[in-house]
Amino acid sequence: MQDGSFFAPATVEGSLSLDRVTFLLLSPSLSLWTSDDVEYRRNQQKLEKMAGYIQTVLKDELDPDFPQGYPSQLFRYHYRTLDDVDIQFGSQLPKRKKITDADIIEAFGTVEEKAEGCMYQYNPNYYAFRVEYNPNKASLRSVSNLLESFSCNQNASLIRIARLDVAIDFNAPIMPQMVLCEGMRKGNIHYGPKGIQTIYFGANKSRNQFRLYDKRQEMIDKDGVDIGHDKWRLELQSRESFCLDSVPDHGKVFQRFTFYDGAVATGDWKLDMIRRDAMNYGLDVALRSMPPNTATRYRKLFKERNFKQNVETPSLVYYREFPGAMERLRCDILSACGFEML
């Protein structure tokens, strides 16, 4: 049973930003995966020329402390600018497509594939040039000369977003225990000196994964900077690939995530724990195991304190602020690639 005094309209508003983006440019000649030895050697030569070209065009922009040109896990060459724009090209793995059509498997599958009921088709990855950056901390100006020359013969509709991190910040001490994420299992939970510091929903390799974490504490740990007020961030990491002119509705994913009423912490951990139990079982049950004097004291606190500071629904923040943020990102990418913006 829930006490109605805990419920009220949201007073902690969220603020949305795009925290990280990865986009791909069509580049068939920069893919190393091919069954043709002649084509492989030809593409390898093109990769070497591209590496030399990047070192020339970006010579004043590259981070001297980064091992420039070394391979990454998926690409032959990896470069990083001073403002943390990552450029990778030369895909070393193919694009894999799962086939479940029974007729195709029966006609072309191996004995093992027929038994498993699926087979895989492998093709060259023609999106072999990748750019990754954080729009909050960097722009694409430092690499615009490279992108303009690289994509001069491309159609803007062929630029693909491979990953997009959508962040919603709440300037309040959120209680991670007071959240619900439908259809996504809780993953790793990281604890800090004050309790839960980060909680994940969804698998690491899934198309969508949520992370709720103490942004203030993260900034202290990473940068030694204290912003002076509480800030919790709900971050959606989406690996749903899409073209710039066909953006998926991430709001449907955010609709899975809900803050219970009273999700803002009071600063009194015992009071917050009692409040959480009272939300589920009622105040009398939450106080039942306490000594009479302690129970009376906390019952009085419940009457005196205002628990009506609730958190705005994340999907509402998304639908209010994402369209503008996405349009700004779209303009930034297209402008950096040399397309005229009307």
Give the location of each predicted region.
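Structured, helix-rich domain cores that form ligand/interaction pockets
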Residues: 1-290, 308-342
